Amino acid sequence: MTERRDNVSHAPDAIEGPNDGAHAEDTSPGFFSFENLGVAQVQVVGGTLNGFSIGFVAVYILLYEVATNCSLFKTTEACKAVGSYGCEWKDTEVCSWKKECDSDSDGVNPCESLIGYSSLYSGIFASAMIVGSMVGSIIAGKCITMFGLKKSFIIVGVMSVVASALNHISVATNEFWVLCAGRVLMGIGLGVVCVICPMYVNENAHPKLSKVDGVLFQVFITFGIMLAAMLGLILDKTVNYDNDPDMAGRFHGFCAVSSVLSVAMFLVGMFLRESTATFSQDDDGKADGGMDPNEYGWGQMLWPLFMGAVTAGTLQLTGINAVMNYAPKITENLGMDPSLGNFLVMAWNFVTSLVAIPLASRFTMRQMFITCSFVASCMCLFLCGIPVFPGVAEEKVKNGVATTGIALFIAAFEFGVGSCFFVLAQDLFPPSFRPKGSSFVVMMQFIFNILINLLYPITTEAISGGATGDQDKGQAVVFILFGLIGLICFVLQFFYLYPYDANQDHENDHGTEPVERILSPVDVPTPRN
């Protein structure tokens, strides 16, 4: 029988009594107090770095397409400035490609294959960080138990700085594989960040503020994505095609933001106060007073692990990544510039995530997550799916309904699904099992992320009858599937969060000693609820 200890986090793992809640309301620190900001800073820096790295790919690919589209540059000076990207000034007084264009091309522009990355390279580039993040989430639990949370932040900071340096080296040498190596390394660090940032807040924030601080991670992820989109819009629209476009300088400037955030992550780790939660390196946790990471076996946690995978499915398999890819296309179809449309979508994504902050002070994580997952699933099914299917609605009606559906889907997702996920990834498990449990849940969402990125375009095209088929058919069917998956996950979460034996004690493995039920904090009310 394993001894159970009480040296756990500040996070509310049990329901407070009325007097305790009132006392906490009177003596707790304010949201903008130094005490709380000292805890929440990990969400600000870690979330922004994560979000900017997510938005990094689309902007970098866009800038690379501009740099390699030699025909855009109108003067000798401008053409020579992009010589490292394969351009040269021809005797015909035009800027063209050093390589011979594909004379057998069926396209309008025979040099189209020389513009930007190939589809294979684009896929490798886009997937590199996600694969690294999956690896990082796997090793996050071991990293926490071996080094502790504070040292884990320092390690991630060092990895991020090295990854950012590789980005700058890639820009200077125009070497694709160096860029991919930097993305993989950054991904490993961010996989760890997705575990340690929410865990540090969960273990160290005041009970009154722990859930509000918890949703900040997703808020600043969306801020980082919007920041990348905004910089991409500015850098794209200010290129001087008649003089020196300074494309290398634009790449370096864009990568410098990631470098600054990486240094900030390292500094956070250096000056961060030690976490109140520590994990013992001793077999039973008695030698140094830390929690025993082996207190619970994987077999004992099968049901929480399963439900963690279900929450990860709600996060990714309802199609947030597909929606983000589909939304810029819709804005382009409506006559909007793609880069501007991309920025507006990301800005809406950020603005809606801000709503989660006041919601977290009034509702439980459970209420926010399952309610918003239901709404988001319905948006996929009834606005983005069925009306888009060919023959169901007229073209104008279809575009209007789909655009509205995407806007409402993003809002519902950020109100409760995305904002609560990283909190629930901690709260579903007892404190001593959180390094393992949270790592598993975060790993599952990265696996689902990879599956969506790989299968979404393939499935859509296949259902549509190929590249020349009606793509609306494939889009509609895929979004209907997203909605159905979301509703199935909703039903499972609804019944799990209201377990039949919620108020009953459970016995230990020997059946002789009652063991205190670990109430999932998704059931725990906030001071205002």
Curated annotation (Swiss-Prot):
Residues 1-43, 141-152, 197-214, 272-300, 361-368, 426-439, 498-529 are cytoplasmic. Residues 1-22, 508-529 are annotated as: Disordered. It is a multi-pass membrane protein. GO terms for molecular function: hexose transmembrane transporter activity. It is found in: Membrane. Keywords: Membrane, Sugar transport, Transmembrane, Transmembrane helix, Transport. PROSITE patterns: MFS. It holds the Pfam family Sugar_tr. The chain crosses the membrane at residues 44-64, 120-140, 153-173, 176-196, 215-235, 251-271, 301-321, 340-360, 369-389, 405-425, 440-460, 477-497. The keyword DNA-binding does not apply. Facilitative glucose transporter. Belongs to the major facilitator superfamily. Sugar transporter (TC 2.A.1.1) family. This is Glucose transporter 2A. It comes from Trypanosoma brucei brucei. The lineage of its organism: Eukaryota, Discoba, Euglenozoa, Kinetoplastea, Metakinetoplastina. The gene is THT2A.
